[in-house]
């Protein structure tokens, strides 16, 4: 039995791992799917004071409260920022880091700072400009969800994803991640690329880490929300790490 902590991405909640978590539990694993402050069932806690640090502490608190060790820590999309921060602080408790079509930051990076590295200039500028405009004009500091259609989520689950995603604090994307270097102690890292949608910033990270010591890069033929599109296949891949 392995201990899995599945960390969701922007606008989502722990709900997005429903089917993957069920498959892992059926196989006998312990699975936690924490929801970040300000989204999902915790949307009532949203506000401009919610930052990347808030979400890192959410996951740290979950692991510490459940007294978990030897954790396989999975982060989807924006969740890659979160799990990197978590691993930096409690690396001895982490067996593996899994970046699920996710950002892989280094010291000082914010998500907004990573977009120009991972996308063509005109595309990254459009993303960043659109995010700021929506946050300022519509919901005062909250970034609006990107529709599931643009992430090529499987058609019969798009409505489910769209109705459950909620705006997220812009500050979570703008806060630089400050690292002390502790995460380097985690020796097993996996990058899972969702190879069925574009324009994807995550091809940049898959290419960057492919072939590097300690990294395994695999591709899934689906849209960005791998845990929604291919939940059982994802569970099988994750279970193999246990």
From Swiss-Prot:
Upregulation: Constitutively expressed.
Show the active-site residues.
Answer: 77 (acyl-ester intermediate)
Where would you say this protein principally sits, based on its record? secreted
What applied role does this protein play in biotech?
A: Candidate bioremediation enzyme, which could be used for the degradation of carbendazim, a widely used fungicide that is quite stable in soil and water and poses potential threats to human health. In addition, due to its broad substrate range, MheI has potential as a bioremediation agent against various pollutants that can be detoxified by hydrolytic cleavage of some carboxylester, carbamate or amide linkages.
Name the InterPro entries on file: AB_hydrolase_1, AB_hydrolase_fold, Sec-Metab_Biosynth_Hydrolase
What would be one Gene Ontology cellular-component term for the protein?
extracellular region
Q: Does the keyword Transcription apply?
A: no
Q: According to its UniProt record, which reaction does this protein catalyse?
A: carbendazim + H2O = 2-aminobenzimidazole + methanol + CO2; carbendazim + H2O = N-(1H-1,3-benzodiazol-2-yl)carbamate + methanol + H(+); N-(1H-1,3-benzodiazol-2-yl)carbamate + H(+) = 2-aminobenzimidazole + CO2
EC numbers listed for it are 3.1.1.122
What domain of life is recorded for the organism?
Answer: Bacteria
UniProt KW keywords:
Hydrolase, Secreted
Q: Name one GO molecular function term.
A: hydrolase activity
Q: Where does it live in the cell?
A: Secreted
Q: So what does this one do?
A: Catalyzes the hydrolysis of the fungicide carbendazim (methyl-1H-benzimidazol-2-ylcarbamate or MBC) to 2-aminobenzimidazole (2-AB). Following hydrolysis of the carbamate ester, the carbamate decarboxylates spontaneously. Can hydrolyze model carboxylesters such as methyl salicylate, alpha-naphthyl acetate and p-nitrophenyl acetate. In addition, shows substantial hydrolytic activity in vitro against widespread pollutants with carboxylester, carbamate and amide linkages, such as dimethyl phthalate, propanil and chlorpropham.
Instruction: Give the similarity note.
Output: Belongs to the AB hydrolase superfamily.
Annotated protein name in UniProt: Carbendazim hydrolyzing esterase
Give the encoding gene's name: mheI
């Amino acid at each position: 039995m392995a201990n899995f902590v599945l960390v969701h991405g922007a606008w989502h909640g722990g709900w997005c791992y429903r089917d993957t978590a069920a498959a892992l539990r059926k196989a006998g694993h312990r699975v936690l799917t924490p929801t970040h402050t300000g989204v999902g069932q915790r949307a009532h806690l949203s506000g401009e004071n919610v930052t990347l640090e808030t979400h890192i502490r959410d996951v740290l608190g979950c692991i510490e409260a459940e007294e978990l060790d030897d954790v396989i820590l999975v982060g989807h999309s924006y969740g890659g920022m979160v799990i990197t921060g978590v691993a930096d602080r409690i690396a001895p408790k982490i067996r593996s880091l899994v970046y699920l079509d996710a950002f892989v930051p280094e010291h000082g990076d914010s998500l907004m700072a990573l977009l120009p590295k991972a996308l063509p200039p005109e595309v990254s500028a459009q993303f960043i400009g659109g995010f700021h405009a929506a946050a300022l004009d519509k919901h005062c500091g909250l970034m609006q969800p990107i529709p599931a259609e643009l992430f090529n989520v499987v058609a019969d689950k798009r409505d489910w994803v769209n109705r459950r995603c909620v705006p997220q604090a812009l500050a979570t994307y703008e806060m630089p991640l400050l690292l002390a270097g502790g995460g380097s102690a985690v020796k097993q890292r996996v990058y899972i690329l969702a190879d069925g949608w574009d324009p994807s910033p995550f091809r940049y990270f898959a290419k960057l880490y492919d072939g590097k010591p300690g990294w395994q890069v695999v591709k899934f033929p689906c849209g960005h929300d791998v845990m929604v599109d291919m939940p059982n296949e994802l569970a099988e891949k994750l279970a193999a790490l246990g």
